Amino acid sequence: MTPLTPEQQQERLEMLIEEFGLHKVRTNQGNRLSGGERRRVEIARCLAIDPKFIMLDEPFAGVDPIAVQDIQSIVAKLKQRNIGILITDHNVNETLSITDRAYLLFEGKVLFQGTAEQLADNALVREKYLGRDFVLRRKSFVDL
């Protein structure tokens, strides 16, 4: 990555603030942000360096349902921009509903890997982790 001039850095900052709707929290300290605001700031900070991949650790933890939908929409937009995303999360439906491929770790080892549908349909996965009544809910982001 080519270093940015101070002017380019400021331009990128303004673009990310606009893209993630962070105007009202621009001068707030991190400990004053809601869970959803914090997640949007975290993702915007990652994008400041124009990455090919980002990792989101528990992005759906501690956020309200509206923020979950917002984060899912952001992830869908990042996928459209060909940015790879690695998500680690215990919120199974929220995560599987937006993933192309999933890896389930159980007792420190990969128990299963495949699409969300394959994972949800696997008998061993249901027995060890999901439970027999688990229902996969997929998201559609047609209006990005």
Model-derived features: where do they sit?
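Conserved catalytic motifs of ABC-family nucleotide-binding domains
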Residues: 50
